[in-house]
């Protein structure tokens, strides 16, 4: 061998030298032995060395150099096949020959392994070797299946046969490895096919599907596959997916309809296909010849065309002289559309399916025999085992195995149906009398298979794995068709099984949702996905419609309703509200059980019309429109599928407006009248022609009725727009919220209107809103009630006077005629005529206003009203009053009211004021009625629930508390005492001004000028009692400070009034009291000394003694550090709802007058204050044991707040 140039050689020279030396030492043809192949002395070791080179060099280093060298050395065709030929069947007992054959297959299996481009692992070296190795694999397959010296595939089975004969429990890992090695080799041979991007120079008939099937049949590979498949789960377990792959690559893309045809019928079918292709070609040529050039238009032609806007356009070519349509089309073709550049998407078509396969007569017969035997013996064991493997996600299960499983399931189900159909046409039975043909595929028609199918569909849809979803949809379609054939078979047992299967398939609402979502969300997944999707929708709707007609009481299970009920029950349990007693205590009540069963049945009842509407939205329509665009390439069954869908939308669902879009109308017109129309000889042409004609006719009529449709034809339609365009009114819906709110209550702006004028205004509003049907309904209800009560009044007038005086005694014993007369106290129930009216009675405020004006009343209160709440005509309304109300409505309809300044009737109404509503709600729900009496006339002050300056209704924007650290200041940054005092004074003035404004706005109003002597006397009496109690408390505390601790230990409580701070000046005391109310109830409060510098406590008490019981509990504020603390006491009986804590200071903590000016320190308390030796004093409230009374320390000297070494006093109070 000539030395290769290292710079040009794609393989390292040393690697090539090693491989070539191994090939030379393997053996060769001997001239002394009649040219037969003779093994070398160390052939077995050489074969093992080759395997090591492939495993440890190519696989470990992710290279293909060794495979490239072996292909160039022609090891497979020149050496390995010749070595296998030296092992005849007569020498099967030779262990050396068996080892050598096994070593040969250990080399051929990796050499024939499918080559895939992994973007994460592909290198430049792969791109150098892949095309060469793909062509080399085609040569390997040609040499293996056409080798005359020996049956190479049969020899592979002979190698694995000793391992297969060992029971599964006694097999060693080596036996398992040999079996899998041979099966993978067979899989590789079946899988090798010419790549789409490379041209094979040899004879493709030698490597075609027909040649492969012929080799598998001739060399008994089919028998081995059937043996392993039929014993799957017993003698074989982990080989299931390998057998499935072999079968998949043998039957994929094979036309099942032709598979079960005999020789003569097959030739006839192929002839019909050829005739159809010729007709299609002629049709294409006919359309092309209309625009094709002739010998008369060799010279150039240019035409000026004047457009609608007056501009001129130049068109070249003599075909522009033909007609206006051609000229417009040429102008459109001259326009260039440059869409935005997008990254090239991955191929959406299943890459392992390839193009359709045409088998010769011999291969067709062999494959049909294998399929029939496989269905009879191996289908159920193999596919049940594979389904279990998929469910448990076995480690040897690969991603593509799921898609192959569902594809083969669909393929064999269709094959079984075709076999039954062929046998029925020939009048023969395909199976034994005691075995139903559908029992042969029962392994994929059970509940476990449906669960696996549903799970795979959901996973593929969520993961956007469109190839797998395509196979799942095809499998689902074939299952439905098979079950439908079972239902139509005429066998009672099969019909029962089919009905049970359909019931389980259609019972889950999740399946309905998945089908609808798949149909609606097609984008650009490819034609295979589009074909499978439309086939599934067509089959699902057709079978579901037929089943729902036969089972009018069909039920579905919804997970949404279950989740809603669980959520509602959980919310009820959390809120602590008692559950309805009728659902718990009355479990044995048959009436309640019947009502619950009826409600559940009504909720679960299936309505096919409502379900079919889910396939009307624009997304589903666009899916079928995209499918119909391939009408030139679709067969009759596919064209029928699209035709039935458009017919269902336009005529069965009465939503033809969804098809009224410019591109859809243009497509439908071109299918019939366009330059590339459907072939008129097609069996579907007449159906499509009639459909298109009716759709365009409806479109023209709809444009006349709804001129707005001209604009809407440019856009897709949402549900609300489509409903309005189709029916002329908006869709009436009721809010699906948990607690729907009724319509707003209205009132008249003018209060001096009489009843007739009010009814006239309400009628005018309904007429202005085109809601005259509500008026008609109200009049009918009133008229019926008037007739009923007129008859009752007539009957009452006709009774004798004696009987009328003895109603209680005699009427009960009267004849049935007299007892049938309604009593005076019987109201008339107002019943809506349809659901839309019921929703209007609940939501339409103008209809509700009219109903109240004519005398209708609600049984339920406003707060508990629901859409199902009943309205009545009370019994106290006489027939004349009802007749008068009808007359007012008729008069207003005939002569609607007219108002000044061109105002409408709706302008005379307004919503009821918020103050009125709040007062009504407060009177209904508030228990504290004493505070509402004084504020009844105020304008909204009764809603003032919090103290002035308290927390607001908005979200708190307080920043989180920062950690307090000492900050070292430079000497130049320290503030002097004068500067600190000035800042404190400004801060105090600002706070006092703010509090004065709050107090003035909240407490000072017009009622302050009025005098109430009784209220004043009561107020001063309460203040006198408080002062007396406080003085008594002071005296007791001065005598014995530990007395309260002893009483607390003995279980006693002392009720004392709240201590009020005595500050200088009324305003200062009020501000201090309001600040105290905003603090945390458990926090400590600071009050001034008992003897303030500005005098007595009476003046301060009078201002600060404003009742605080109206203030609600607010959010606890941070604790504040005080200079001094005292004890906390509970409020008196009148103030039991809230505490007003105050503190006092002992004589030991007195300070100078300068320090008293700033006694409250606003620094927050520490979370764990230091303990001090104090006396605990805790006062409790006898009236409310739930109050959180905090034990407060006795007067304790706190650590003063310090900054930069100076002790700072608070400046919040003066």
From Swiss-Prot:
Alphabetical keyword list: Cell cycle, DNA damage, DNA repair, DNA replication inhibitor, Meiosis, Nucleus
Domain of life: Eukaryota
Compartments where found: Nucleus
GO CC terms, sorted: replication fork protection complex
Composition skew (Basic residues), residue ranges: 557-569, 960-970
GO molecular function terms attached to this record: DNA binding
Chain positions covered by the region annotation Disordered: 316-357, 555-601, 815-841, 894-1017, 1044-1214
Main location: nucleus
Pfam family, one: TIMELESS
Subunit architecture: Component of the fork protection complex (FPC) consisting of TOF1 and CSM3.
Function: Forms a fork protection complex (FPC) with CSM3 and which is required for chromosome segregation during meiosis and DNA damage repair. FPC coordinates leading and lagging strand synthesis and moves with the replication fork. FPC stabilizes replication forks in a configuration that is recognized by replication checkpoint sensors.
Similarity annotation: Belongs to the timeless family.
Official protein name in the record: Topoisomerase 1-associated factor 1
Gene that encodes the chain: TOF1
């Amino acid at each position: 061998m000539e030395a290769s140039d290292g710079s040009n050689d794609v393989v390292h020279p040393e690697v090539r030298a090693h491989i070539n030396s191994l090939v030379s030492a393997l053996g060769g043809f001997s001239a002394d032995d009649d040219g037969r192949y003779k093994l070398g002395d160390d052939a077995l070791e050489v074969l093992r060395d080759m395997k090591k080179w492939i495993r440890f060099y190519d696989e470990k280093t992710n290279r293909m150099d060794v495979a490239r060298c072996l292909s160039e050395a022609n090891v497979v065709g020149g050496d390995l096949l010749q070595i296998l030929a030296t092992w005849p069947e007569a020498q099967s007992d030779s262990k050396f020959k068996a080892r050598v054959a096994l070593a040969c297959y250990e080399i051929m299996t990796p050499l024939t392994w499918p080559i895939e481009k992994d973007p994460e692992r592909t290198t430049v070296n792969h791109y150098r070797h892949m095309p060469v190795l793909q062509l080399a694999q085609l040569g390997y397959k040609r040499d293996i299946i056409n080798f005359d010296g020996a049956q190479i595939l049969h020899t592979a089975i002979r190698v694995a046969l000793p391992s297969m004969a060992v029971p599964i429990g006694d097999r060693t890992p080596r036996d398992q490895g040999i079996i899998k090695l041979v099966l993978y080799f067979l899989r590789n041979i079946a899988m090798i096919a010419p790549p789409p991007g490379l041209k094979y120079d040899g004879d493709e008939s030698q490597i075609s599907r027909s040649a492969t099937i012929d080799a598998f049949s001739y060399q008994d590979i089919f028998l081995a596959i059937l043996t392993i498949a039929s014993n799957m789960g017993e003698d074989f377990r982990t080989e299931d997916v390998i057998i499935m792959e072999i079968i998949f690559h043998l039957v994929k893309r094979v036309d099942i309809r032709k598979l079960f045809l005999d020789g003569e019928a097959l030739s006839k079918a192929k002839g019909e296909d050829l005739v159809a292709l010729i007709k299609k070609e002629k049709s294409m040529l006919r359309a092309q010849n209309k625009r094709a050039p002739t010998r008369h238009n060799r010279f150039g032609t240019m035409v000026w065309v004047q457009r609608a806007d007056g501009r001129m356009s130049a068109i070249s070519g003599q075909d522009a002289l033909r007609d206006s349509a051609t000229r417009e089309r040429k102008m459109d073709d001259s326009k260039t559309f440059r869409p935005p550049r997008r990254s090239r998407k991955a191929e959406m078509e299943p890459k392992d399916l390839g193009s359709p396969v045409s088998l010769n007569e011999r291969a067709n017969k062999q494959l049909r025999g294998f399929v029939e035997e496989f269905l009879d013996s191996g289908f159920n064991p193999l596919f049940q085992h594979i389904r279990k493997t998929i469910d448990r996600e076995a480690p040897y299960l690969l991603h593509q195995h799921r898609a192959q499983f569902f594809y083969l399931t669909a393929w064999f189900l269709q094959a079984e149906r075709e076999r039954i159909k062929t046998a029925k046409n020939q009048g023969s039975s395909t199976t034994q009398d005691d075995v139903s043909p559908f029992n042969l595929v029962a392994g994929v028609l059970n509940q476990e298979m449906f669960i696996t199918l549903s799970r795979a569909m959901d996973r593929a849809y969520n993961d956007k794995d469109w190839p797998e979803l395509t196979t799942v949809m095809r499998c689902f379609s074939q299952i439905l068709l098979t079950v439908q054939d079972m239902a139509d078979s005429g066998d009672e047992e099969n019909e029962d099984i089919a009905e049970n299967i359909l019931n389980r398939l259609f019972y889950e609402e999740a399946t309905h949702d998945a089908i609808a979502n798949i149909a609606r969300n097609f984008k650009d997944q490819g034609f295979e996905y589009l074909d499978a999707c439309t086939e599934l929708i067509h089959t699902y709707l057709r079978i579901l419609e037929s089943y729902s007609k036969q089972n009018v009481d069909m039920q579905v299970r919804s997970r949404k309703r279950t989740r809603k009920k669980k959520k509602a029950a959980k919310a009820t349990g959390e809120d602590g509200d008692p559950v309805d007693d009728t659902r718990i205590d009355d479990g044995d009540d048959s009436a309640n059980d019947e009502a619950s069963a009826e409600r559940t049945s009504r909720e679960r009842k299936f309505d096919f019309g409502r379900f079919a509407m889910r396939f009307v939205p624009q997304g589903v329509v666009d899916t079928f429109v995209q499918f119909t665009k391939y009408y030139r390439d679709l067969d009759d069954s596919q064209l029928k599928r699209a035709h039935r869908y458009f017919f269902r939308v336009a005529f069965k669902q009465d939503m033809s407006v969804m098809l009224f879009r410019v591109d859809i109308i243009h497509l439908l017109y071109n299918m019939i009248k366009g330059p590339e129309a459907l072939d008129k000889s097609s069996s579907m042409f007449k159906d499509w022609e009639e459909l298109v004609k009716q759709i365009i006719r409806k479109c023209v009529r709809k444009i006349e009725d709804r001129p707005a449709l001209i604009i809407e034809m440019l856009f897709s339609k949402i549900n609300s727009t489509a409903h309005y365009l189709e029916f002329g009114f908006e869709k009436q819906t009721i809010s699906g919220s948990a607690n729907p709110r009724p319509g707003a209550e209205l009132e008249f702006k003018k209060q001096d209107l009489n009843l007739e004028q009010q009814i006239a205004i309400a009628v005018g509003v309904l007429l202005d809103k085109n809601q005259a049907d509500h008026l008609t309904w109200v009049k009918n209800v009133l008229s019926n009630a008037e007739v009923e009560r007129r008859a009752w009044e007539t009957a009452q007038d006709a009774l004798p006077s004696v009987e009328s005086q003895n109603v209680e005694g005699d009427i009960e014993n009267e004849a049935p005629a007299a007892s049938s007369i309604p009593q005076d106290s019987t109201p008339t129930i107002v019943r809506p005529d349809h659901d839309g009216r019921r929703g209007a009675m609940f939501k339409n405020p103008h209809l509700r206003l009219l109903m109240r004006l004519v005398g209708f009343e609600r049984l339920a209160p406003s707060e508990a009203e629901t859409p199902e709440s009943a309205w009545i005509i009370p019994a106290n309304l006489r027939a004349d009053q009802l007749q008068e109300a009808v007359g007012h409505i008729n008069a207003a309809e005939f002569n609607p009211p007219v108002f000044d300044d061109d105002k409408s009737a709706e302008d005379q109404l307004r919503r009821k004021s918020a103050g009125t509503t709040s007062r009504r709600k407060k009177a209904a729900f508030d228990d504290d009625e004493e505070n509402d009496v004084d504020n009844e006339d105020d304008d909204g002050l009764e809603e003032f629930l919090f103290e002035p300056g308290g927390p607001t209704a908005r979200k708190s924007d307080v920043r989180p508390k920062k950690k307090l650290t000492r900050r070292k200041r430079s000497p130049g940054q320290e503030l002097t005492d004068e500067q600190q005092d000035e800042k404190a004074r400004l801060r105090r003035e600002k706070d006092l001004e703010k509090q004065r404004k709050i107090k003035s706005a909240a407490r000072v109003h017009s009622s302050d000028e009025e005098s109430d002597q009784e209220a004043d006397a009561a107020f001063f009496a309460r203040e006198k009692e408080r002062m007396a109690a406080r003085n008594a408390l002071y005296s007791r505390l001065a005598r014995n400070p530990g007395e309260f601790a002893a009483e607390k230990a003995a279980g006693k409580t002392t009720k004392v009034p709240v201590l009020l701070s005595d500050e200088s000046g009324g305003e200062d005391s009020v501000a201090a009291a309001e600040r105290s109310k905003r603090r945390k109830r458990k926090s400590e409060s600071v009050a001034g000394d008992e003897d303030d510098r500005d005098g007595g406590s009476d003046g301060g008490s009078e201002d600060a003694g404003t009742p605080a019981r109206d203030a609600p509990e607010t959010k606890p504020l941070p604790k504040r550090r005080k200079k001094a603390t005292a004890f906390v006491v509970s409020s008196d009986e009148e103030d039991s709802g809230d505490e007003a804590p105050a503190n006092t200071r002992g004589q030991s903590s007195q300070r100078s007058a300068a320090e008293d000016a700033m006694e409250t320190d606003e620094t927050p308390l520490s979370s764990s204050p230091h303990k001090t030796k104090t006396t605990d004093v805790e006062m409790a409230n006898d009236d409310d044991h739930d109050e959180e009374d905090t034990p407060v320390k006795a007067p304790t000297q706190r650590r003063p707040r310090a900054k930069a070494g100076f002790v700072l006093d608070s400046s919040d109070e003066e």
